[in-house]
């Protein structure tokens, strides 16, 4: 901020007193002070304190040449808004009198405060010191109060207040020009929609062509597997066991893989495996570990499976022998 050398505002004490007067909502009671014209002082801080006029409204006379007379007080902060918001000062025909009563001062120093929604939008970098200044006479929740003698907001603020993404239009543009400007967005949107419909029409025939050979090949592969499976089952017992598990529904109820109730047996051994194990059981009911390993290799089973089979076979033999013994005893008692 530059001041002329002859001006008393160059003194730091006077500048500090001006700032403190704005902070504490009190009035400056100096006898006289020289105020330079608006062309020399263009800063925002001094403008809002009442030393300079605000931005003039479009179409009105510029107030830069109008100088301020000697004041006996510094008015209170009237408006804290964005520097680019259009405001105007009502010009009065009579000059400001050197003597004012406190009532007139309070009436003229009414401010135009905004609701809580508008206050945070003033950037802290622009107004770091005076952001919390608010007089008691100005309600916060209510609507804006027009000022009788100083700043008044133009009607452009009332229309743009309710727009959440708040932005200032450049001064050159007018609402008529904005309405007449063409909008090129609907044309590409319709073009993309037409392209999407054409692509949807082209896509369905492709899966149909890809599915048809799969359906033709699937029965061939199934027949090949059915032809190969009997040949392999005749050679190896493992495939026989797997084939017996897979073809459960095709087998009759009296088959050796299923029980009388129709459920699948717990350990469905093949005929070849059961025959070899039965022969070994008739020859020797209790196997050594070496003999059990040999049988497991020959029958293509594990050592544990052979061991469990012999245990179950012994329990079955014991049960059968007990039933036969009871039957013999009962038959002997009846005839005697």
Swiss-Prot record:
Pfam family, one: Homeodomain
Chief localisation class: nucleus
Region Disordered, residue ranges: 161-256
Keyword Oxidoreductase included in the entry's annotation: no
Localization annotation: Nucleus
UniProt feature, compositional bias: Basic and acidic residues: 161-171, 240-249
Gene3D superfamilies: Homeodomain-like (1.10.10.60)
Keyword set, alphabetical order: Developmental protein, DNA-binding, Homeobox, Nucleus, Transcription, Transcription regulation
PROSITE patterns given in the database record: HOMEOBOX_1, HOMEOBOX_2
A GO CC term assigned to this protein in UniProt: nucleus
Matches recorded under InterPro entries: HD, HD_metazoa, Homeobox_CS, Homeodomain-like_sf, HXA10/ABDB-like
Ranges annotated as biased composition (Polar residues): 209-221
DNA-binding region: 262-321
Molecular-function GO terms, alphabetical: DNA-binding transcription factor activity, RNA polymerase II-specific; RNA polymerase II cis-regulatory region sequence-specific DNA binding
Family recorded in the similarity comment: Belongs to the Abd-B homeobox family.
Function as written in the Swiss-Prot or TrEMBL entry: Sequence-specific transcription factor which is part of a developmental regulatory system that provides cells with specific positional identities on the anterior-posterior axis.
Protein name per its UniProtKB record: Homeobox protein Hox-D10a
């Amino acid at each position: 901020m530059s001041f002329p050398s002859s001006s008393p505002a160059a003194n730091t004490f006077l500048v500090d007193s001006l700032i403190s007067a704005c902070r504490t909502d009190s009035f400056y009671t100096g006898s006289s002070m020289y105020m330079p014209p608006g062309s020399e002082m263009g800063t925002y801080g001094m403008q809002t304190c009442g030393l300079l006029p605000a931005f003039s409204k479009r179409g009105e006379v510029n107030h830069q040449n109008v100088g301020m007379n000697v004041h006996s007080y510094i008015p209170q902060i009237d408006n804290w808004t964005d520097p680019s918001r259009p405001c105007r000062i009502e010009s009065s025909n009579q000059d400001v009198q050197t003597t004012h009563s406190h009532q007139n001062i309070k009436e003229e120093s009414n401010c135009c405060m905004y609701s809580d929604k508008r206050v945070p939008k003033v950037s802290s970098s622009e107004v770091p010191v005076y952001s919390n200044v608010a007089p008691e006479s100005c309600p916060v929740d209510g609507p804006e109060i027009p000022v009788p003698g100083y700043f008044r907001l133009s009607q452009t603020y009332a229309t743009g207040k309710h727009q959440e993404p708040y932005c200032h239009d450049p001064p050159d543009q007018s609402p008529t020009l904005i309405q007449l400007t063409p909008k090129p967005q609907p044309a590409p949107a319709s073009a993309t929609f037409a392209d999407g419909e054409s692509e949807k029409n082209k896509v369905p025939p492709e899966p149909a062509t890809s599915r048809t050979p799969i359906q033709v090949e699937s029965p061939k592969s199934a027949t090949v597997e059915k032809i190969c499976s009997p040949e392999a089952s005749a050679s190896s017992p493992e495939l026989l066991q797997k084939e017996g598990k897979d073809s459960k529904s095709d087998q009759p109820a009296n088959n050796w893989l299923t029980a009388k109730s129709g459920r699948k047996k717990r350990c469905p051994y093949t005929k070849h495996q059961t025959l070899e194990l039965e022969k070994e059981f008739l020859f020797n009911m209790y196997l050594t570990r070496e003999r059990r390993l040999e049988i497991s290799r020959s029958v293509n089973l594990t050592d544990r499976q052979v061991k469990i089979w012999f245990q179950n076979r012994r329990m079955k033999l014991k049960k059968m022998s007990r039933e036969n013994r009871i039957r013999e005893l009962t038959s002997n008692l009846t005839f005697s």
